[in-house]
Amino acid sequence: VIHGDLTYGVCGEGFSVIFGYGEGGPVSLVYDGKECLYRAPKPAVWRASTENDKGNGFPVKSAVWMASDMFAACIGCTVKEYAKDKEYPFDVTDIVGRVPAAEDIDRVEITYCFTTRTVPETEIQISYQVNPAGQIHVQLHYKGKQGLPQLPEFGLRMVLPEAVEEYSWEGLCGETYPD
């Protein structure tokens, strides 16, 4: 674990990941020497409209989500380090009082909070848990509010540094899609 002024790094055998405190997520993800990210992942809350959507006016009713998708703003970041199931909170704003990372850290959790560009505003949280094997467990949480229109999509948008030529998708049912 590496504590930086603007970044937080985790590295192990065959991998490294660098989280930007103000970037809203990981800014670098390297496995076996190959960079896997072009930019930090962001919440995805808008999708292309279908013919059915257009027929019932959905794109107009839910247009606020398009702005929220395009202009997602990270408003905070928290870091927790774990060693032998004991939690060690880490203050990302305390540059002066930081102590070096403990050698026995067995996982870290970085959580970013995004605000939506809707009225009323609400929040989306993205948590990344990284273990020593380089596995990253990602969780997204949406805190809905009364009065908001239907949410078109909820997911994580990742921009990769190069086109993917081969992949497999295991969706939950016929209603899910790999984009």
Each predicted region: which residue ranges?
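Beta-strand/loop-rich accessory regions of lumenal/periplasmic or secreted enzymes
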Residues: V1-D179
